[in-house]
């Protein structure tokens, strides 16, 4: 096993622990808590894949971080922060909409790269909107936290989420997964719209119905 893979996991575990302590003191906002919950699932998946104990990894990560901080000067820290591009967090969904449980009468599930797609094929002839919470950098979608499909009545009928065991995806991966979800929902006569945030940062183009512009062979 590559040593960088192990040490990266150890540092991630310790930093998650620090963020959890921060949240436990009531100091985290909604986007912070969203990421905390998602990252916990990701760490569990990575730990299982690597065969590493999270508690042991957290202690090792603490030692690594302490060593780095001991060597770090304030001036170096300022230069590092200044050179890192900042990302923005965009939220179509409330925390309640993100954490709400839902079930499918006729489930269809598919894995597309590192993204997990689920939809209820029992839903027919409904108006559906896709909402997503994600981060943006350089005016492009950086990381998808969660995407869900809602009916006008507020019922959840579809979802796209990152697989904890396969971290990392591009805006193109998200676009492809959304097209799969849209195609599955429209198969039963549903009308699907995409939120303005997704239109702007994932596709940069749309048609008059608020839908992503699909390649010619898919129209």
UniProtKB/Swiss-Prot annotation:
Posttranslational modification: Upon interferon induction, ISGylated via host HERC5; this results in the impairment of NS1 interaction with RNA targets due to its inability to form homodimers and to interact with host EIF2AK2/PKR.
Q: Where is this motif: Nuclear localization signal?
A: 34-38
GO CC, one annotated term: host cell cytoplasm
Q: Which InterPro entries match?
A: NS1, NS1A, NS1A_effect_dom-like_sf, uS15_NS1_RNA-bd_sf
Q: GO molecular function terms here?
A: protein serine/threonine kinase inhibitor activity; RNA binding
Swiss-Prot/TrEMBL GO biological process terms: symbiont-mediated suppression of host cytoplasmic pattern recognition receptor signaling pathway via inhibition of RIG-I activity; symbiont-mediated suppression of host gene expression; symbiont-mediated suppression of host mRNA processing; symbiont-mediated suppression of host PKR/eIFalpha signaling; symbiont-mediated suppression of host type I interferon-mediated signaling pathway
Localization of this protein:
Host nucleus; Host cytoplasm
- For region RNA-binding and homodimerization, the annotated ranges are 1-73
Q: Where is this region: CPSF4-binding?
A: 180-215
Q: Where is this motif: Nuclear export signal?
A: 137-146
Q: Keywords, A to Z?
A: Eukaryotic host gene expression shutoff by virus, Host cytoplasm, Host gene expression shutoff by virus, Host mRNA suppression by virus, Host nucleus, Host-virus interaction, Inhibition of host innate immune response by virus, Inhibition of host interferon signaling pathway by virus, Inhibition of host PKR by virus, Inhibition of host pre-mRNA processing by virus, Inhibition of host RIG-I by virus, Inhibition of host RLR pathway by virus, Interferon antiviral system evasion, RNA-binding, Ubl conjugation, Viral immunoevasion
Q: How does it assemble?
A: Homodimer. Interacts with host TRIM25 (via coiled coil); this interaction specifically inhibits TRIM25 multimerization and TRIM25-mediated RIGI CARD ubiquitination. Interacts with human EIF2AK2/PKR, CPSF4, IVNS1ABP and PABPN1.
User: Which function does this protein serve?
Assistant: Inhibits post-transcriptional processing of cellular pre-mRNA, by binding and inhibiting two cellular proteins that are required for the 3'-end processing of cellular pre-mRNAs: the 30 kDa cleavage and polyadenylation specificity factor/CPSF4 and the poly(A)-binding protein 2/PABPN1. In turn, unprocessed 3' end pre-mRNAs accumulate in the host nucleus and are no longer exported to the cytoplasm. Cellular protein synthesis is thereby shut off very early after virus infection.
Q: What is known of its domains?
A: The dsRNA-binding region is required for suppression of RNA silencing.
Family, similarity comment: Belongs to the influenza A viruses NS1 family.
Instruction: Output this protein's name.
Output: Non-structural protein 1
- Species per Swiss-Prot/TrEMBL record: Influenza A virus (strain A/Swine/Wisconsin/1/1967 H1N1)
